[in-house]
């Protein structure tokens, strides 16, 4: 089982990740980390609150990238939004993460969930309007079942990671 991190607090999440107890973590829902912080700072004037929010989120991503073992997979679940150009992206707060960082660009795998014909699916590759991406040989089709265990097994198989459950 993955360790599900569902607490909207960067310090707690980063502490849990640094403990290195598990081979997989699920952060659900990462977008709420930004949204809750925005609400906490709603009475602050100016752009500093947006800068703080972006830096806290970027620090979380840096912790994931630099402070978890190579064979540890952190699944970041987030909401999406459509831009004014019709493209789909991870929903963020403010412009700093979008304009200076582009969150999706930090990851080698980005899947998007959707519902069709009474089934939930993941899209594994972009059609030019979504941020979806994965190594071409990782999945057999452009759409797969919305099954995180299947995804985890495919990633571990592709990269040669231990499939050990913890």
Predicted regions and their residues:
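Residues that form generic nucleotide/phosphate-binding pockets
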Residues: 16, 67, 154, 158
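Basic, amphipathic N-terminal segments that precede the first structured/catalytic domain
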Residues: 1-24, 142-149, 162-166
